[in-house]
Amino acid sequence: MRLLNIVSSPRGARSASIAVARAFVDAYRQTGATIDVDTLNVWEEDLPDFDSGAIGAKYKGVANAPMDEAEQSIWRRIQSLVKRFQDADRIVVGVPMWNFGYPYKLKQLIDLVSQRNMLFTFDGNAYAPLLEIPRALVIHVRGQSREPGAGADNPGFRHQADYIEFWLRFIGVSEVRSLTVEHTWGARASDSIERAQARAVEMAAEF
């Protein structure tokens, strides 16, 4: 069993999303199956820029057209990242909320690996996923809550979760489970994170 653990917070030991994901992964290791954890930290990986060179390689790759040496180098790096998704049996993603969205490095990873004929297909009429991953867990972390009057009941607060969960289904994850962690700053942070870690342990048993 290969678990792809995507880390998108740069805060290390101070990160709520990393703390909750670690509790989940540690508990999942105790479920009896042999678990190989592949941790993909978007802040530590040497992610290539998705610039004109990468986009040029992308379109040549789709068209099976010859690439120059620089494009081949970028394309090999993209293929290496894609393979980590292709090899995964389960996915865990920790996503702190940044300005109602997600860390830009996570979006960079998504842009790099979301390649036609690698993670999805398109026949001119419809898209179809190429992965066959039974389930993923997304840990959504935000400092505010959806309590009445807190402001987080605005539909914009769903943007983060809707996008990440849609993308996972788009590439071939059958079931996307979510764990939302709120109040991750101030006096309530410690209790909120501990409750989320306890819930993560429970969820690991059925993952």
Curated annotation (Swiss-Prot):
Reactions performed catalytically: 2 a quinone + NADH + H(+) = 2 a 1,4-benzosemiquinone + NAD(+); N,N-dimethyl-1,4-phenylenediamine + anthranilate + 2 NAD(+) = 2-(4-dimethylaminophenyl)diazenylbenzoate + 2 NADH + 2 H(+)
EC class (word): oxidoreductase
Gene3D superfamilies in the record: 3.40.50.360
Disulfide bond sites: none
GO molecular function: electron transfer activity; FMN binding; oxidoreductase activity, acting on NAD(P)H as acceptor; oxidoreductase activity, acting on NAD(P)H, quinone or similar compound as acceptor
Oligomer status and interactors: Homodimer.
The protein's name: FMN-dependent NADH:quinone oxidoreductase 2
